[in-house]
């Protein structure tokens, strides 16, 4: 997609070198927006392969209100493993090799990388096979799904923001309050990772549903391709439920950054030419957005260039 390649190019040419929480370092810009017309095809990278089924299982995980990686691992989705693993290796229950700064060390030290990968595999197996262990160490805190579906009130009750949003679109589509927030300051200290994509708003006009996301922190090379596809999919799912066509997905970013150890991968991607966008295919079976399963969602005509590997910064 040209919009995304333009973002990469803009940050490479105009970004500022900054330090960051992970110690990796970034090239960063503040305040950037992309717009995608969802009528023109499903917005997923074609200049590198994005594993769409991982996008789907993560979004369904959010929609279920789940915050434990066990569901993800049961669907062969490893994108949240590092944050749960980090919590485990910092606990008194962990008795293995020292895992301090495991992400950076695995990138720089091949011998340590083998040790880290072995420990990670043991951790994943225990999460899947041991429910008690998963309950304790698979939890990521009150992240996205919890805030979307069970926002805690001061009276001890909960708010299902997503269900309320869908009902409001049906009954009051002109409302300017069609908003869901994942940013709950009270819960931030207990989250494995505070929400990067922190707030989204819907807008209805001319029989079409559009979505705007505000993302406080945008990992351009690894995270943003997932975020675009995820919120485009969410827009399609909600539009289907409320009987509207899809309009635009507008992606507004705060700190949009390229990690310093992703620069060569970015340059490789910029050398590629975008292909035609695929079409989203949804099963007619699910009654509501909350009834979808991974097998109900697919892409038709997705023929991307090969994937480009890059390390994740934790």
UniProtKB/Swiss-Prot annotation:
DUMP binds at residues 21, 176-177, 216-219, 227, 257-259. It is an enzyme of class 2 (transferase). It is found in: Cytoplasm. Keywords: Cytoplasm, Methyltransferase, Nucleotide biosynthesis, Transferase. The keyword Mitochondrion does not apply. One of its GO terms (molecular function) is thymidylate synthase activity. (6R)-5,10-methylene-5,6,7,8-tetrahydrofolate binds at residues 219, 313. Pfam families: Thymidylat_synt. It comes from the Bacteria. The active site is at residue 196. GO terms for cellular component: cytosol. One of its GO terms (biological process) is dTTP biosynthetic process. Its EC number is 2.1.1.45. Pathway: Pyrimidine metabolism; dTTP biosynthesis. Belongs to the thymidylate synthase family. Bacterial-type ThyA subfamily. Catalyzes the reductive methylation of 2'-deoxyuridine-5'-monophosphate (dUMP) to 2'-deoxythymidine-5'-monophosphate (dTMP) while utilizing 5,10-methylenetetrahydrofolate (mTHF) as the methyl donor and reductant in the reaction, yielding dihydrofolate (DHF) as a by-product. This enzymatic reaction provides an intracellular de novo source of dTMP, an essential precursor for DNA biosynthesis. NCBIfam families: PRK01827.1-2, thym_sym. Homodimer. HAMAP family: Thymidy_synth_bact (MF_00008). This is Thymidylate synthase. It comes from Listeria monocytogenes serovar 1/2a (strain ATCC BAA-679 / EGD-e). The lineage of its organism: Bacteria, Bacillati, Bacillota, Bacilli, Bacillales. The gene is thyA.
């Amino acid at each position: 997609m040209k919009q995304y390649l333009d973002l990469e190019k803009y940050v490479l040419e105009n970004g500022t070198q900054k330090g960051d929480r992970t110690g990796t370092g970034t090239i960063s810009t503040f305040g950037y927006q992309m717009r995608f017309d969802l009528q023109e095809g499903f917005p997923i990278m074609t200049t590198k392969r994005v594993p769409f089924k991982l996008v789907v299982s993560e979004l369904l995980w959010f929609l279920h209100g789940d915050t434990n990686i066990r569901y993800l691992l049961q669907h062969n989705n490893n994108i949240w493993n590092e944050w749960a693993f980090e919590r485990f290796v910092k606990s008194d229950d962990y008795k293995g090799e020292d895992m301090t700064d495991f992400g950076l060390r695995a990138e720089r030290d091949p011998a340590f990388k083998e040790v880290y990968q072995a420990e990670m595999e043991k951790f994943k197996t225990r999460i899947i096979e041991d429910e008690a262990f998963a309950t304790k160490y698979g939890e990521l805190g009150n992240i996205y799904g919890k805030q979307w579906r069970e926002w805690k009130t001061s009276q001890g009750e909960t708010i299902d923001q997503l269900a309320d949003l869908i009902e409001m679109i049906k009954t009051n589509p002109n409302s300017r309050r069609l908003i869901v927030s994942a940013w709950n300051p009270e819960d931030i200290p207990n989250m494995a990772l505070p929400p990067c994509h922190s707030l989204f708003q819907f807008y209805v006009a001319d029989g079409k549903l559009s979505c705007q996301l505000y993302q406080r922190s945008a990992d351009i090379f690894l995270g943003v391709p997932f975020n675009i596809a995820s919120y485009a999919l969410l827009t399609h799912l909600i539009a289907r439920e409320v009987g509207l066509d899809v309009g635009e997905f507008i992606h507004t970013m705060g700190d949009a950054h390229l990690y310093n150890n992703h620069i060569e991968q970015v340059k490789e991607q910029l050398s590629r030419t975008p292909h035609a966008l695929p079409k989203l295919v949804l099963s007619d079976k699910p009654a509501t957005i909350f009834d979808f399963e991974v097998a109900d969602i697919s892409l038709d005509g997705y023929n991307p260039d090969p994937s480009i590997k890059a390390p994740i910064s934790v």
